[in-house]
Amino acid sequence: MSTYTPKAGDTTRSWYVIDATDVVLGRLAVEAAKLLRGKHKPTFTPNVDGGDFVIIINADKISLSGDKLTKKFAYSHSGYPGGLRKRAIGDLLAKHPTRVVENAITGMLPHTKLGRQIQKKLKVYAGPEHPHTAQQPVPFEIKQVAQ
């Protein structure tokens, strides 16, 4: 008997909703990346997208540990000489809270074609409302919240 290898169409995808209120950003990103990648399933295969859809709500109420709001920076470069921009995570969180959460999660996914395909299953919203109620997402609770 040969070993079973799951194909792309063999997996059934679930929808999970995660409330990010008072959850530390890194802990949220780890759990979301596991769900997106499919590592919680016994049929996990590294070269197949077998993960689930993840909806994150209340991204604007995320928590950061320590002094990261002022001392951690997000860098971007325009491509021109002297075009390096440096913004504190606190400023970025105030303007674009969804972008901070998306960048934290996508940094934990593979940086390949498969990783870009997995990123499409991540939906992040700043407020408590999301348009995916028809998919009947299951609430996923993260046990560790900010102190």
From Swiss-Prot:
The lineage of its organism: Bacteria, Bacillati, Actinomycetota, Actinomycetes, Mycobacteriales. Part of the 50S ribosomal subunit. InterPro entries: Ribosomal_uL13 (IPR005822), Ribosomal_uL13_bac-type (IPR005823), Ribosomal_uL13_sf (IPR036899). GO terms for molecular function: mRNA binding; structural constituent of ribosome. GO terms for biological process: negative regulation of translation; translation. GO terms for cellular component: cytosolic large ribosomal subunit. Belongs to the universal ribosomal protein uL13 family. Keywords: Ribonucleoprotein, Ribosomal protein. The keyword Ribosomal protein applies. PANTHER family: LARGE RIBOSOMAL SUBUNIT PROTEIN UL13M (PTHR11545:SF2), RIBOSOMAL PROTEIN L13 (PTHR11545). Gene3D superfamilies: Ribosomal protein L13 (3.90.1180.10). It comes from Mycolicibacterium gilvum (strain PYR-GCK). This protein is one of the early assembly proteins of the 50S ribosomal subunit, although it is not seen to bind rRNA by itself. It is important during the early stages of 50S assembly. The gene is rplM. The keyword Hydrolase does not apply. This is Large ribosomal subunit protein uL13.
